[in-house]
Amino acid sequence: MSRRGPPISAFAALSSADDDEVIGYEQSDEDPESVSEQRPVSEPPELARAQPSAPVYSAPNAPVVVSCSKFVPTSENVVYGRGYVVIGLKADEFLMVKGQYTLKIQRGAVQIDSILYHSSHDPVKIYGLSLSSIPLISAAQVTDQNLVEDTVLPETEHLFTPNYKSVIRLDDVFDGLEKLGLLYPQLKNIHPNREDIDEFEGSAFAKSFYPYSFKVVENPSNNLGTYINKTWKNALEALTSPSGSAEDMRVLVIGAKNTGKSTFLRLLLNKLAAHEHISPKVLDIDPGQPEYSLPDCISLTTHHKPIHGQYFPFLCEHPARICYIGFNTPQRQPIKYISQLKALSSHMDMENGPLLINSPGWIKGFGVEILKELTDAVRPTHLVYLSFGGEDDNQLLCNLTYENLVRVPVPGFNSRGYDIVRYSPSQIRNFRMLSYFHYNRYEKTFDFEPLLARSPYKISYADFCDRDALIRYPGLSGISILDAANINHEDLVECLETQVVAIFELENEEFINLYDEMVQRGQLGSLESYPNLFNNTLESVAPEFRGLALIHSVNTTAKYINLYTPIDVARLSKSLASNETKLVLVKGRSDLPTEELIPKMISKTALPYVTYAAFGKGAKSVNVRRNVQRKTK
């Protein structure tokens, strides 16, 4: 089915584009003034039988909100160990576990957000953070006894009775991510158990989880669990039914903000990836809220197993195709964005497997132009439209190209009515940026000590533009600024310090082509003691994106740049030293939290001219107003 509507100019559409919706963080009762270090394991208290906990249900014709476990803790069905907890689940019981942990199924089977797992020795690692809906772990029926590998231990033998359907073990994962709040306090409550034990208010069961990296949410809370209603279940089953050809499926999920696009796509991804011989691909084209990409990037990734909880793209073992956009919105450079989008689309047919497309929550103005270009390039077999309903639906759909329409109605949802904590898009972007820069790829841990407390990497740069000399130079060849707007070369240092840049490698032949193009167009600028300035966005060549870096400072006397980056610097240095590739940095407008530049942990006293409460004048970026018409006198 192919439908068409009147064409929309990308530039004209910018004037009518939606503004980003910001959902502010609401302080909760779990928001203490200080964050303490992890305490050692203590003996668990004796648990009294509690009343059954139940999820919080909304009013009729509104979405169901699950904010806690459906589980009755007793001294029998919960076994505490050093670094782990074993829990027995009865039929119809489920757990909402907040925090980070590995899950092992010791008896029977469980469902994690509709994905069935049988007992096995293979652990499932889960980051159940409250940045998004928290996975639910439900007791489930075994479907194939050949898949069951029960583990009976003396301490849990009493759980292997007809009273219990499933037995699971949760193990600690203290990898440093739980200390994010020390650097960025706005997100300290995405992890549990950050309160001081002496000030902790809660039941004996809640206190028993204090030493662990996770906790079972026992009572109604301000967290949100993943709930799959009947409409979603039917849509997911229709898309993954055996009658269809999953290998050839291309699914585009669209909808306005807060309709659950990302959650629906994640559930569909998991259903497909749960099959042994299916490896779905995800085309993530939302640079503002990327689920499967690095900050300010779009990507094409392949997934071989389900994803439960928070996903970290830099932990992916399989290489991804990444395009650096440099901005958190396509509005900045719409033509470049669409060009990058088409470049990614051209690689889709090189790998087998279904394709799922994670689109921005932007279905008006320039967002329609993006979706139109995307559907023309991808030709989706299924268009999943999560809609609140309205007259604008048909106007949107008639502009898009697709074969089958799956319309999923979305009831209105207001998180404030349920005291659900929601974080703003900027806070989530800060989380992704901080977790990326503070990950140690060698130790496979996070370290949220301020970057300023570490020694940066040093890289020399060229301040000359002689062709032969530049080709032989083993350091930084030049810097490209995506929105340079005829920047003065003498102001380059001020434009670079404390800024996030992308690291690109070019094969020598590609660099020679780029050099010749820039010379011909007058795009190569050099100034003594300053890095070379490339007024070129590198679109005409094929550079390899290596990752992001934060520039600490520029030393114009010794001609080197200090920077921080989590990428494999040793491999990059070896490649440059052997003169196999050339190095170029590209700067966009990536945001960095103030806490990274001026961390609170440096001093307990107030810093002059610095505030963490609000932006000062001139702190926010200024956008050019478009279509401003003034009357002449």
Q: What feature does the model see in each segment?
A:
Residues 2-249, 253-254, 267, 271, ...:
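Preference for solvent-exposed, low-hydrophobicity sequence contexts
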